Amino acid sequence: MEEYQIYQGFPTEWLGAWESINGNPDVYIFQGYDGNYYLLGYNYDKESERGNFSCYDMNADENGWYIRMGMKCCLLMSESSPYGLHITSWGSYMKS
C-alpha cells in the first residue's frame, strides 16, 4: 500500500482559478487524486497566439506553502482585499 503525505492546514480558499493583476501567468490551484496540491500556470503569448502550461508541486515547510521553479522557491501567501493571493516573484492574484 502506498503512503501519501497529507498536508494539514492547507488554505482551502486558495483552491480554484486566480487571475494575475500584473501580467504574470494566471494560475489554477487544485488537489490531485494523490492528495497532493498543485499549481497550474497558464501564460498566453499574443504575438505567437500560443498558450503555455506549467504544473508545479506545492509543498509546505516552516515558512509556509511554496512552489519550486528550478533552484528558486516562490512562497504563496494570503493577501488582504481586494486580491487574496500573493506569489513571490509573480505578484498579486484575484480569484476568478
Which residues make up each language-model segment?
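Generic ordered-secondary-structure signal
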Residues: 16, 22, 45-46, 67
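N-terminal glycine/threonine-rich, aromatic-flanked beta-hairpin/loop signature
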Residues: 24-62
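Beta-sheet ligand-binding and adhesion/scaffold domains
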Residues: 1-7, 21-26, 59-96
